[in-house]
Amino acid sequence: MRKVSPGLVCIVLGVVLLLAAGGLGAYNRYEDAHAGAEAQTVVADLQQKVETPEPETESGPLDPELPVVEIDGNEYVGEISIPAIGIDLPVMSEWSYPRLKIAPCRQFGSSRTDDLVIAAHNYESHFGKLTSLTAGDSVTFTDM
């Protein structure tokens, strides 16, 4: 039986690791593109379903619960728009890891009580470009 040199083992292991890294990178790009396409489809549906707010007739306290719209089995509370980086995405009513693969999610709080926290992946099509924002850039959340 022939002895395998340590150098050959290192070369083969290096090639395998490079292929694995390339595959992981390709999968991440696919997931990013898929999430972006799905979010844009939902945003178009949301914009058609957005209710026109009725003028308030009572001077009572505002209900902090955000109204939801259901699309394809997921509930959405609004839309986030960041024109400086070309972001216009739906926001899901509750967060979970599987939901984050579709669109940004409300982690907690409400826009009506000024404590809304939105979480999203760092996909290029989601919040991946936030680092390029500058002070004064507009960020708008529109609820249902």
What are these regions (language model features)?
Residues 4-144:
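Solvent-exposed, non-transmembrane regions of membrane-associated and secreted proteins
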